Design a protein with these regions (language model features):
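Residue-level recognition of tetratricopeptide repeat
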Residues: 13-14, 48, 82, 150-152
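Short coil/linker segments at helix-helix boundaries
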Residues: 1, 95-140
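Structural register within alpha-helical repeat arrays
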Residues: 20-24, 55, 89, 96, ...
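Canonical positions in the second alpha-helix
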Residues: 2-6, 40-41, 74-75, 144
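TPR alpha-solenoid repeat register
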Residues: 16-17, 51, 85, 153-155
């Protein structure tokens, strides 16, 4: 309350007050207020990475992943070796790609006889995800690892490199079970 009062009555002190408010709102995880203060600070200092990071975190807290990704990419436009932005984008694309691959595998397994869509179409879909999202994740993780290598990044890069377009094999139990469920 005191900071808001000072900000209102002493306009020349706004930037300093906003810095303190931003820190407070980040600590409280108050995404809407973080976003408001960060935008106000960015209007004066658009290239400030700390403000952009706070804005990206707030957007993520609000569930706006796409906008958070764009802000993180803006950070990389300013500093292409920013560890946090590269790590965030690597994680984002890795998760997005793995979710798509899992969805394709599930769809393939649910296709009772493999007749609705041929296996080659599923493989092509998986190849596309690996070439797009997974390759993007590997690129960002590789840059982050060059800046500050750690075990997590090495494991993620290894795991992502091991992904393939191979289709899952269903056991003899799953297909009959799925058929029975569909009939009931």
């Amino acid at each position: 309350q005191v900071l808001l009062l000072v900000k209102k009555q002493q306009p020349w002190f706004t930037r300093v007050t906003n810095n303190y408010l931003l820190g407070y709102y980040v600590f409280r995880h108050d995404a809407e207020k973080i976003l408001a203060v960060a935008d106000e600070l960015l209007s004066v200092m658009p290239g400030q990475i700390n403000y952009l990071k706070a804005k990206a975190d707030a957007l993520l807290l609000l569930g706006n992943d796409t906008a958070a990704v764009e802000v993180q990419k803006t950070i990389l436009d300013i500093d292409s070796l920013n560890f946090d932005a590269n790590l965030f984008l690597g994680c984002y694309y890795a998760i997005k790609g793995q979710e798509k691959l899992k969805s394709i595998d599930q769809q393939y397994l649910e296709d009772s006889n493999g007749l609705s869509i041929s296996a080659s179409v599923y493989k092509e879909e998986k190849r596309q995800v690996i070439d797009d999202d997974i390759a993007c994740a590997k690129k960002y993780f590789t840059i982050a690892a060059r800046v500050r290598s750690n075990k997590y990044l090495s494991e993620q890069l290894s795991m992502l490199s091991g992904l393939s377009d191979e289709l899952p094999q269903s056991s003899g139990v799953i297909r009959p079970f799925l058929k029975r469920l569909k009939q009931e």
